[in-house]
Amino acid sequence: LCYKASFLTQTEKRHVPNDTTKPTAPMSRQFPATRMRRMRRDDFSRRLMRETQLTTDNLIFPMFIVEGTGQRQSIPSMPDIQRFSLDELMKEVAEIVELGIPAIALFPSPDVASKSLDGREAWNPDGLVQRAVRALKTTFPALGIITDVALDPYTTHGQDGIIDADGYVLNDVTLDALIRQALSHAEAGADIVAPSDMMDGRIGAIRSALEEAGHIHTRILAYSAKYASSYYGPFRDAVGSSASLGKGNKHTYQMDVANSNEALHEVALDLAEGADMVMVKPGMPYLDIVRRVKDEFGAPTFVYQVSGEYAMHMAAARNGWLDESAVALESLLCIRRAGADAILTYFAKKVAVMLRR
């Protein structure tokens, strides 16, 4: 299948012949007739003119799962975040639902014995994720379940796809594996499959496979602008891929952190191929990208406040340098202000409690 994505960047638009778009004239306001502090004086007026809101409806809680029973495993690099066995997951999710958080995202930390060169455990119909999805949808049918589509938790080398003899990730061969993984999630009952692998063409391939299999209501959240960031370290500890990846990197498929226009091309392609939502990852260091994506496309735009962002905030808070609650709320509000519709954040549960107060 061939997909056509068409858009012009703001820079390109400025060079379109006969473009009649004119810049908006600045307001003419002067002191003392205008005193900007007047509207900031009282809490009621600050609230009345607040431009951006953060509610539990904007929150998605990423959750890590492991095999076994009675497991709540702490993650040293991510304070207060745990890996859950399925029985403990059900207890934790009951609290999430009670707090009004609309969706969770599942990330597996599979046993080392289940890993392989091709990551075939990823599409095992009785795999960890697939069993978790079935159990969750049975008990919490209204909760949105998002599943990660990528091979890195399941490969012995820690890459997101299938590699050749030189360690290079093979794009088109990997697509077949991603299709099988996404279909296994949809068949288990996942509401949203979220390809985070950054292979070219994977959104179109997965969308076509879902349609052909009758999963017409399964949504796709595309990790469209996923950067080869240094902020992912604690996450890789959580899913057990750090040791597998070793000194390797993902620069041949994740985006260069220096690039901005490239993100718009990635988003345009994913939307053309059938993505329902797009994502920018990481969050706060990439708010310029969030704003550009939202302004350019107006599509549902999600942001992942990643493990490194969470770890930095928590480290500063634990040392008494920052107020944990205040910076958690501020960071998420800033992501919303940049244009995010929803945010995957490890602060979701804590912030939901704060918002309830």
How does the language model describe each region?
Residues 58-60, 67-357:
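Alpha/beta enzyme core
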Residues 17, 22-87:
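An N-cap/entry alpha-helix motif that binds or orients negatively charged groups
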Residues 5, 9-11, 20-25:
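Ala/Thr-enriched low-complexity intrinsically disordered regions
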